[in-house]
Amino acid sequence: MTHFKWWQTAVFYQIYPRSFADGNGDGIGDLTGIMARLDYLKDLGVDALWLSPHYPSPQFDCGYDVADYTGVAPEYGTLDDFKRFLDGAHQRGLRVILDLVLNHTSDQHPWFVASRSSRDNPKRDWYIWRDGKPRGGPPNNWVSTFGGSAWEYDPAIGQYYYHYFFKQQPDLNWRNPAVQAAMFNAVRFWLDMGVDGFRLDAIGTLFEHPALPDSPAAPTPRDLFQAWHSGVTATEPAEVIEARLKAMFQYQVDQPGVHGVLRALRALVDEYDDRALVGETDDIAYHGNGNDELHLVFNFPLMRTRRLTPAWARANQAARLAALNAVTPFGAWPGNTLGNHDVPRVYSHFGDGDASRDDALARLSLALTLTLRGTPFLYNGEEIGMTDFMLADLRQFRDNLGVWACQAMIEFLHFAPEEALKQAAQRGRDKCRTPMQWADAPNAGFSPAGVETWLPVNPNYAQGVNVAGQLAQPASLLNFYRRLLRARRNSPALITGDYVPLHEDAPDYLAFLRRNAAQTCLVVLNFFERAHTVKFDLPTRAARLLFSSHERGADDLSRLSFAPFEIYIAELT
């Protein structure tokens, strides 16, 4: 009998610590605030927490520019606070994984400060330093994914250092064994403390082509921005844009050395009992043989559509599950998500501005995430229908990607400053990182009245988009989340069962079975605002209702009627 691990059966909940809960009243979320909300998370019905970066950082890239891998940012608390948070989570049966940024450090990390101090410093080779071309200019034509050259000149020493992201985030040299040893020591530090694993940020960027050849497809800054702009505005198919970007960065991402590091990291993690590695990638190759690299990679293709449809979901599942099975029938496992701290919020991304439809589509998106085969990942605030909030003043921006987008739209697309600001607010990531909305109270209950929060609070907390108000309403989105999470927890087939598609030509609804040795469940998701009557040719006509978004009577599987946007889950008997 197959034994499933906790990371296969869990529902993960991502906490963006700066925006989750302000425990000390300074306008910034912190560990004390998170600890005060652990009972809420337990009652919600999730099983594991993914904590976005909590390390000391200058915050140029919102914590993904790490200045100390074994510390806690002072605005979030202390190491003792972290230990109390971890203990509190474990006491409630909640696992905890940490974000781990392996590719680069902050330019203020002591390692880089030492590295740039002289060519003879022992840490010089911890980063990627090169001389420029004989006639001047950077070593090659590579670009940063955030625009401009990937090489930054240091006039004090007369060499360039490489950065795939912002120049404030110099890449580590993973070909240096001392770098791997130092980073693995940080991993051991947190594992020894008891964390349950890591989400590995930007894992495909650890290595570059060793010869540093010029890229034949290297874009100009304008080319890069236009490709990025096309992606976020959906003016071209996602696969077309992805192929173009892959060509642009062909020597900078997904190089062979990554697999060796992941195998070594997996061996380290496997020295500890029951820990997990999740990669910020959708590349199934990073499972290795299914048991020697990452435990989970994300099914990012699932979210790369403007509108969720049955055809999209079917095609995604067929492709992903077939690819996983090609690695190994059991060792690889899907990680399903529709939202995180880098992309539009689910309610805004899949909605169309009509309140009733948007609410129904938000419920369908959760149902899809929780009923497909794999481990679901939710993002804080999804459960109350938090929406993107567009900032109206560039001085409020905290995401430097948004600042770059504003400048690029003026320079490359010749937008007027007002239009560039509007577009940058939509393209940047601040919109999905605003403070969690806990109550219909000043600052949405995130911070005390009169405190300026690190990002502005979305004012729709006063229109019912808050935890306290929705807890008191049985039909609210929050209580829907709680009900559906409970239904999943009580249905073994929904957690570990196979996925069997049904009615594969149906344009308006998605139907499939989830089945294991203990149970077979029928799932029907009606994605459109019209009713349907459906006949199922199944071995049994009897079913026990497990969950429905609508009131229902007894069902005969030979002829089932579904209301507009209905979510239906039944156990075949």
Give, region by region, the residue ranges found by the protein language model.
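Beta-strand-rich binding/interaction modules
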Residues: A531-E551
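C-terminal beta-strand-rich structural cap/linker in extracellular carbohydrate-active enzymes
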Residues: D556-T573
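Extended, hydrophobic alpha-helical segments in both membrane/secreted and soluble proteins
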Residues: F198-I203, S365
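Loop/helix patches that line or flank the sugar-binding groove of alpha-linked glycan CAZymes
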Residues: W6-Q8, A211-Q250, G260-Y272, A276, ...
